Amino acid sequence: MEKEVIVKWKIKESETTKILTLLPELAEQTKKEAGNIYYSIYQSEDNPNELILHERYVDQQAQEAHRNSKHYQSIVVDQIAPYLEERTVYVVKKLI
């Protein structure tokens, strides 16, 4: 069963510019994953320090493979997570 994930990041204001430079590589590598169906990153128009990541994977195993991937660990865990004020993850299912 497909896994759809919505993630909200609130970045420390002083770090937003730095974090934005890391996103193209993260998106490029994630989209190359065998189990990735969709991956997109959005920035709030009201608060540029807030990002929404929309991800879809073929199944739970593909989602876990993403979280364990070298690029996720290197970019998200090592370079982005330390600068987040807030991180909320929603695993959702499509209703309509």
Language-model features, listed with the residues they occupy:
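Short secondary-structure capping/turn segments at boundaries of alpha-helices and beta-strands
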Residues: 27, 38-41
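Residue-level preference for beta-strand/loop junctions
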Residues: 1-3, 33, 49, 83
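Short hydrophobic/aromatic patches at helix-to-coil boundaries
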Residues: 92-96
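Short alpha-helical
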Residues: 14, 48, 71
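An amphipathic, aromatic/His-enriched active-site/gating alpha helix that lines ligand/cofactor pockets
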Residues: 34-37, 56-90
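N-terminal first-folded block
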Residues: 3-31
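Short, well-ordered beta-strand segments in beta-rich or mixed alpha/beta enzyme
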Residues: 3-10, 40-67
